[in-house]
A protein has these predicted regions:
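Class I S-adenosyl-L-methionine
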Residues: 1-177
């Protein structure tokens, strides 16, 4: 049985008609930061599964663009996003990598695959996340460390709050069975 509520993701976090735990969170072609809102909702509601098809990621590309000159002086890898088209595409790719690391650091097993063939849609990345009941040899902390390393290496430390690095370090997103 399905029920639908007309509410924002933020309001849904505390909506009295929603249970404390949600089985599945989906976000289909959720533009820009809407996928991040869905992830935050899923984490807050201890979702067992998340099915995400991100779209139009612009936030990370914007930060890359702001720091492009500094990045080019620091690392030859900044050539990956020197040109505007590459900035947009690389920003999109990195956004999804960061999302996957955030999910893994929060106790989810993550698989990334295609939704449909590339000939049908360029926005085609499907992120599947399944909540794990154990930490599997420190996988959460390794993912958290990698998340921090990627943000620092790419000159994106101001995005640590967006990807909840501090909450992950304090264990406030602890997975419960």
């Amino acid at each position: 049985r399905m029920d639908f509520l007309a509410t924002t993701v933020q309001e849904a976090l505390t909506h009295p008609d929603l249970p404390a735990r949600i089985d599945v969170v989906t976000a289909l072609h959720a533009c820009d930061t809407a996928t991040d809102d869905a992830i935050a909702f899923g984490l807050a509601k201890h979702a067992s599964h998340m099915v995400l098809v991100p779209c139009c990621q612009a936030e990370v590309a914007g930060v890359l663009r702001q720091h492009k000159a500094l990045s080019l002086s620091r690392s030859p890898l900044a050539e990956l996003w020197r040109h505007p088209l590459h900035t947009r595409e690389f920003g999109s790719q990195i956004t999804n990598v960061l999302r996957c690391l955030q999910l893994e650091a929060s106790g989810y097993s993550v698989t990334v695959t295609e939704l449909v063939g590339w000939e049908h849609s360029m926005k085609n990345e499907l992120i599947l996340a399944r909540r794990m009941t154990d930490d599997r040899h420190g996988a959460r902390e390794r993912a958290r460390q990698r998340l921090v390393q990627v943000l620092d290496e790419l000159g994106l430390p101001e995005l640590k709050a967006r990807f909840a690095v501090d909450q992950l370090a304090s264990g406030s997103s602890t997975v419960t069975a």
